[in-house]
From Swiss-Prot:
Binding-site residues, ATP: D687, A688, M689, G690, L691, G692, K693, T694
Source organism per UniProt: Arabidopsis thaliana
Domain Helicase ATP-binding: 674-871
Region (Disordered): 271-293
Keyword terms, alphabetized: ATP-binding, Chromatin regulator, DNA damage, DNA repair, Helicase, Hydrolase, Metal-binding, Nucleotide-binding, Nucleus, Zinc, Zinc-finger
Disulphide linkage map: none
Protein name: DNA repair protein RAD5B
Domain Helicase C-terminal per the UniProt entry, residue ranges: 1113-1277
Subcellular location: Nucleus
A GO molecular-function annotation: helicase activity
Function (record text): Possesses intrinsic ATP-dependent nucleosome-remodeling activity. This activity may be required for DNA repair. Does not seem to be required for DNA repair and regulation of homologous recombination (HR).
């Protein structure tokens, strides 16, 4: 018998024999077990199959051999076995000196480079993981040294690499030899040598184990199990016969095949039989030794296979194919000492062997190592194992079963058929110790271990205690030796605790779990058990995280410029701000670059509802159409029967839970049906300020009125065993009954009256009922609130209610049809209570209205997506991994992905957006922006210079000590005083802690020509409270923690917390006492301290009034407007209410009629001020704080804007200007910014320009700190 190559296989049998130039012979494939092909798999993973051939032997010269083929079931030698006229390889000739290296790697079909790379990558992985650096390694496995050449690592990392490789070699050697070994690793440049591989008698086994490990690496690198590896036999296996050996080992290397015929005895057969008889007749005179040897040999191998000798020659896999499921096939004969394992496989050929009639040197091998053979195939035994599977346990669910080929790590032990095996693993994960799963039996102890491709993922599951493995032996050798294959049938069970109640899922909106914990290896279990989802998710994390995945987004110039700016900044190529003035951008263009502006001219237009009293512009009709379509979704019945797009459905073996649903992003599993009802409907209307977002929303409310449905938003699920018809009923029955509300609009307090007025103005009478839920007379009846079509409230009221009752607050007990967040950037920080309160609201549709969805950093958008319930992006782990971090690192995928997410969710138009005809969508009067540079008087300059020098000395000390950022608050305090000094020195002289600035008193007297009043000291017990009071006196009033607005009638608690008196008393259940909402301290009403309201200034500012340079320039502008007689109205913005106090003095003296609007005004006071300013002609000036007037207000009655002091964030100033330059404005808007020359204000403009060039969120924490330090140094130049 022989195996031929492809060319010969295409010939006929006779032609093949006649054309066999290299003296190859041909034999037939026998008929055996369904006439399937046979293959032999060695312990190294190499599989060899016989091919069809003639039934006659051909000698080396091409003539017919005198010896005919062996009959059926005849076995030839313990090296090769001929069964059914097929040549197979026995395990007794394991490759004991397998050389895997570039010279000895004989690979066909052009796969040599792949295999060499696979071997080298295996070693590179060990070296790289230990050193943390990349390395270039050339591997050659020889006996007895392991050479690793061209090791490119840093010298200081060498010791760690040596230890890692030494541990790896120790493990291989110890596993192969069964005993501990002492390995010495010597690093020689450029080679890494491993010496002293245990004792000499174990060298062959160790070399074989190392070689097998490399073969396993090669096998894993290909798509099929068999590999193109040349297997060389031991050059000389012959050793002297030891007296106590059962089998003499005098077999020498042969180049011939010796075949013995059972039916026709020959000289060869006679010689073989004589040799066998001599073997068993030798020993003591009484024959006991021979008898004992024969009994031991018979017990060593089961009866049924007859052995002969076949000397091996090199075998090579030439044409590997994808293999079928392994099957073990019986060999039946009367007697045998050799057993082989055979498996069906596609056509594979090996090199031919030669025939010889010489038998003088043919003898039995001492090291005969059998491979297991059973009388029934695996399929039959698998059925028996399934029938006798493990008993059902209450809380454990059977997922599936699989055949696993394990490896033995023990000698001389025996496994019974269907014997139960137990699995163990290390309870502590260590980077030096791989994940190993060992198996044992109660009878024999440890037997072996699972392959690493199973252990790597199984250990993490087993450690959780929620997954367990139970196994039985299917096929194993009768007596085990090292590194033999054992076939196990393993069952996998999962505990019921692994299932998540979807309504209580930890994958919450706005949650921030550890990303690694969300990547659950349960998916790996399904993969190895070949369990595929019968209902797949719409998209997977792999698709999102793949570098090959294309989002089909066009790269625009702005995006590339932004990424280039990041790269330059990371490389230290940042140029000075003065050299880059031409790169300065407006906040509007900055916003457009990051989030983009929609091509809205392709949108259809929708006519306004008849109940709307105003006319909509074309772009507003487009917005109405887009919002209406966004609110349309699948109906309730379909949603209750539709699987959520982030979940997949799998079928398992356990009848109690035939289906498991797995969240592919969080890894959570459930046996309940996750419905699609949570999917949000709505989006972000991000039109630039002044385009009429309020009117568009009112048109939507009138066009699509509705009431909430309890089942629409709650994350509830139906029983998995319910059919589709009952799923909706069960789903609704599980839902908590809530009142059905209309539209909830949440806005800042300053916009409450404006929303109410707009709703009443733009809708016909009795069309909608509006409730303003604000103030002390609020009702707590959910049904009464829900009865109104529109409910208006503030972020402060919502947050206060949420803090008290969390998800059971008055707003959370209503299922709203629609929720609208006006000025939605208010919740840009997703960790705040205000943001969390909005996340927990229940509604059918959700809308965010904001002209600045991105203010400071990319993370601002994340909070909006959390409110909209856009999965999986409402989870911080995935947002951070796939968007935030790539964006920070300059990876364009981060920016592309956020654009892809926002494209269907956001509609954004700017004042520069054009329609189909190329015209601007909104024609507004132009703006005239000027910067007025003020020159300080001599007294002001001296005062400022002294203050600056003192501040700079303190700042330089912080820099020298390296504690700048540790004293960041103190430095901001220094900058605050410098900025206030630019407005008016009185603001600095209002400080009560005069000791720090005592040396400035002489300069103050020069400016005021009067000494400041002294400040009395309070009792020490009230010192800390007085510090808090002083913040309020200085104009640095903090917002009330309950309503999130500037404190109105502020009070101090004994625990030194400041808030509105009304907000605090309203939060108490009793009128006389309650808890502090901050620290939960018990408070009494009599203990509350009213904050001082007397003048904050240390001097009598009215009596000692003197105009500063900035105030003088402002008065000149106002006088000019007054003299013109045009009736123009002006708004003066400042961020300090104390400066507004000072401005009142010269305005009164010069006869100007003015009003004031700041955070201290209550809601009714604000309504009165705005109404009077818009309707009366006498009040031409409005003093307004930048914070209170920067959002949402419609101030088109004014046409002149005065910005008295620069703000850190230019977007805040832009918002204030847009209150005037918007729809309804009919005059040119004049904007005047006041800057004092050669002061910190001038440098603040440069800092503003720097911030505008920085892409939000594009810096690491370290770079943020470095940027802050550079900005501070710029300000103190």
């Amino acid at each position: 018998m022989a195996i031929v190559d492809d060319a010969e296989m295409r010939l006929t049998e006779s032609e093949a024999v006649s054309s066999s130039d290299d003296r190859k012979i041909v034999a037939d494939t026998p008929d055996f077990i369904d006439e399937s092909s046979l293959v032999i798999r060695t312990t190294t993973g190499v599989r060899i199959s016989a091919l069809p051939a003639e039934q006659s032997l051909v000698d080396s010269d091409g003539s017919n051999s005198e010896v005919t083929l062996p009959a059926k079931d005849e076995v030839i030698s313990d090296g090769f076995t001929c069964v059914n006229k097929e040549i197979v390889e026995s395990d007794s000739f394991r490759e004991q000196n397998l050389e895997i290296g570039e010279p000895d790697l004989d690979v066909e079909n052009r796969k040599e480079a792949m295999i060499i790379d696979s071997i080298e990558n295996s070693v590179v992985e060990i070296v790289s993981s230990a050193s943390g650096d990349d390395c270039n390694v050339k591997v050659e496995v020889v006996e007895p040294e392991l050479l690793v050449e061209n090791l490119v690592v840093a010298k200081e990392e060498e010791e760690m690499i040596v230890d890692s490789i030494e541990d790896s070699v120790v493990e291989i050697v110890s596993t192969a030899s069964g005993c501990d070994c002492n390995v010495k690793v010597e690093v020689v440049d450029p080679e890494l040598c491993v010496d002293n591989l245990v004792v000499v008698k174990e060298e062959e086994m160790i070399a074989d184990s190392i070689a097998e490990s490399v073969v396993e690496t090669v096998s894993r690198g290909l798509d099929y199990e068999c590999v193109d590896v040349k297997v060389k036999e031991e050059p000389d296996l012959g050793t002297k016969l030891e007296e106590d050996s059962v089998f003499p080992n005098v077999l020498e290397k042969k180049d011939e095949v010796i075949k013995v015929l059972e039916d026709q005895p020959s000289e060869i057969n006679k010689k073989l039989e004589q040799e066998n008889d001599d073997l068993f007749s030798s020993g003591d005179s009484d024959g006991t030794s021979a008898k004992r040897r024969k009994m031991e040999m018979e017990s060593y191998a089961p009866v049924g296979v007859e052995s002969c000798i076949l000397a091996p020659t090199p075998l090579r896999v030439v044409k590997p194919e994808k293999l079928d499921t392994p099957e073990v096939i019986d060999l039946e004969s009367e007697k045998s000492y050799t057993h082989v394992k055979m498996e069906p496989v596609e056509e594979i050929k090996v090199e031919a062997v030669k025939m010889s009639s010489q038998v003088e040197d043919v003898k039995f091998s001492r090291e005969q190592k059998s491979v297991y053979v059973k009388k029934e195939p695996v399929g039959a035994r698998k059925v028996k194992v399934e029938d006798g599977d493990f008993p059902v346990e209450k809380d454990w669910y059977l997922v599936g079963r699989s055949l696993v080929t394990a490896t033995s790590t023990s000698k001389g032990r025996k496994l019974e058929d269907n014997e139960i095996v137990n699995f163990t693993f290390s309870s502590v994960a260590k980077w030096k110790v791989p994940n190993i799963v060992r198996f044992s039996t109660k009878r024999c102890g440890e037997i072996g271990r699972l392959p690493m491709e199973w252990s790597n993922w199984a250990v993490s599951l087993l450690r959780s205690g929620k997954v367990k493995m139970l196994g039985r032996c299917v096929a194993a050798p009768p007596f085990l030796t090292m590194m033999q294959e054992i076939m196990l049938y393993v069952s996998f069970y999962i505990h019921s605790s692994i299932f998540t109640d979807v309504s209580k899922s930890t994958w919450r909106i706005g949650s921030s779990p550890n990303l690694e914990s969300t990547l659950h290896p349960l998916l790996q279990l399904f993969k190895h058990l070949t369990i595929k989802p019968y209902q797949k998710a719409e998209f997977t994390p792999e698709e999102l995280n793949s570098r090959k995945r294309s989002l089909n987004l066009e790269d625009d110039y702005d995006e590339r410029a932004a990424l280039l700016a990041i790269a330059k900044r990371r490389k230290g190529c940042q140029q000075s701000l003065e050299q880059n003035k031409d790169e300065e951008e407006a906040p509007e263009s900055y916003m457009n670059r990051v989030v983009g502006a929609a091509d809205s001219y392709n949108l259809e237009e929708m006519e306004a509802p008849s109940t709307l009293t105003c006319n909509l512009r074309p772009y507003q009709k487009q917005a109405l159409y887009w919002m209406s379509e966004s609110e349309k979704g699948i109906d309730v019945e379909k949603a209750a029967e539709t699987l959520h797009p982030c979940w997949e459905a799998y079928r398992i073996c356990d009848e109690r839970a035939p289906s498991i649903y797995l969240n592919i992003f969080s890894g959570e599993a459930t046996i309940q049906f996750p419905t699609a009802t949570q999917m949000a409907r709505g989006g972000i209307l991000a039109d630039a300020m002044g385009l009429g977002k309020t009117v568009m929303t009112i048109a939507l409310i009138l066009a699509r009125p509705g009431r909430g449905n309890p089942e629409n938003e709650d994350v509830l699920v139906a029983d998995v065993n319910a059919d589709k018809r009952n799923r909706k009923e069960i789903h609704m029955a599980l839902t908590t009954v809530k009142a059905k509300g209309g539209t909830l609009i949440i806005c800042p307090m300053a916009l409450l009256s404006q929303w109410k007025d707009e709703l009443e103005t733009h809708s016909k009478p009795d069309t909608v009922s509006v409730l303003v839920y604000y103030g002390g007379d609020r009702t707590h009846d959910a049904k009464a609130i829900a009865s109104h079509d529109v409910v208006l409230t503030t972020y402060g009221v919502l947050t206060s209610a949420y803090k008290q009752d969390m998800a059971n607050s008055i707003f959370h007990r209503i299922d709203w049809y629609r929720i609208v967040l006006d000025e939605a950037h208010t919740i840009k920080s997703w960790k705040t209570q205000a943001a969390k309160a909005t996340f927990e609201l229940s509604s059918h549709c959700r809308w965010c209205l904001t002209g600045t969805p991105l203010q400071n950093k990319l993370e601002d958008l994340y909070s909006l997506l959390c409110f909209l319930h856009v999965e999986p992006w409402c989870n911080w782990a995935w947002w951070s991994k796939l968007i935030q971090k790539p964006y920070e690192n300059g990876d364009p995928r981060g920016l592309k992905l956020i654009k892809a997410i926002l494209r269907p969710l956001m509609l954004r138009r700017t004042k520069e957006t054009r329609d189909k005809e190329g015209s601007l969508i909104l024609e507004l009067p132009p703006t005239d922006v000027q910067v007025i540079e003020c020159e300080q008087s001599e007294a002001e300059r001296d005062f400022y210079t002294a203050l600056f020098k003192r501040s700079k000395v303190q700042f330089d000390q912080f820099v020298a000590q390296g504690k700048v950022l540790h004293n960041y608050a103190n430095i901001l305090e220094l900058l605050l005083r410098l900025r206030q000094c630019c407005n008016h020195p009185f603001l600095v002289m209002s400080r009560a802690d005069s000791q720090q600035y005592a040396d400035l008193d002489s300069l103050a007297r020069r400016f005021l020509d009067n000494n400041p009043d002294s400040v009395s000291q309070n009792a020490p017990s009230r010192a800390y409270i007085e510090e808090v009071i002083q913040d309020l006196r200085d104009g640095n009033s903090k917002e009330c923690p309950i309503c999130l607005e500037s404190a109105d009638d502020p009070v101090l608690t004994p625990c030194a917390h400041r808030m509105c008196r009304e907000c605090l008393l309203t939060s108490w259940r009793s009128p006389s006492c309650g808890l502090c909402p901050i620290c939960r301290t018990i408070l009494k009403r009599t203990e509350l301290i009213s904050c001082p309201t007397d003048s904050i200034f240390r001097v009598d500012v009215v009596k000692n009034w003197k105009e500063s340079s900035k105030v003088s320039e402002l008065l000149k502008c106002l006088e000019k407007i007054k003299k013109s007689g045009s009736g123009e109205k002006s708004i003066v913005f400042s961020q300090w209410t104390s400066f507004l106090d000072l401005l009142e003095i010269p305005l009164r003296r010069r006869g100007f009629e003015f009003l004031r609007f700041d955070g201290k005004l209550a809601q009714k006071g604000r309504e009165k001020v705005l109404k009077e300013f818009n309707e009366t002609k006498q009040k031409t000036i409005l003093l307004m704080s930048l914070k209170a007037g920067g959002v949402g207000l419609n101030l088109t009655a004014a046409s002149s804007v005065f910005l008295m002091d620069p703000w850190w964030n230019p977007a805040v100033e832009e918002q204030a200007i847009m209150r005037i330059h918007r729809i309804g404005q009919k005059r040119t808007v004049f904007v005047r910014r006041f800057i004092v020359k050669d002061t910190v204000e001038e440098r603040m403009q440069q800092v503003q320009a720097r911030k505008q060039r920085m892409i939000a969120g594009a810096l690491t924490d370290e770079e943020v700190r470095s940027a802050r330090l550079e900005e501070l140094k710029m300000l103190f130049r």
